[in-house]
């Protein structure tokens, strides 16, 4: 998002003026030298609440939304797996499902489906302790089934909003509360250009 707004530039390789955030290892450089780095938060918030909300940025915000949803879904599934003490290797099942479904379902529907699928896994685990293949199969079948159920639900049903679920993401909070006026629509609606 900062790259799209021109605040930073992603560099092809690390250089003297580039930075890398631990964990990401992606080199970047700061491109707003007229704004001291310490004042960036206030200036960026003002920029996001004014110029960045112009219609010309709508497609960029849609791309950001489309990038945030899979990350939020993955973080939420990981969170649910850890609550039930399942290993992260079950996240592989999610990767094959995210692409075909990502434009039809809201993040709240994904969160509901992840929660329900992991609860089903927990039930199967009690009946068949240690049967990893059965758990994998349960997750692989329950996630799409639960997602399909959300399509026929009434507004707000089978949909988890951020106020009732963890983990929380600072970028998501900025995106739906400051940079755009999406608010709860971020959780309740699939990514759509018409919402900007």
Set out the residue ranges of the language-model regions.
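Basic, alpha-helical nucleic-acid-binding regions used in initiation and control of genome expression
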Residues: 1-196
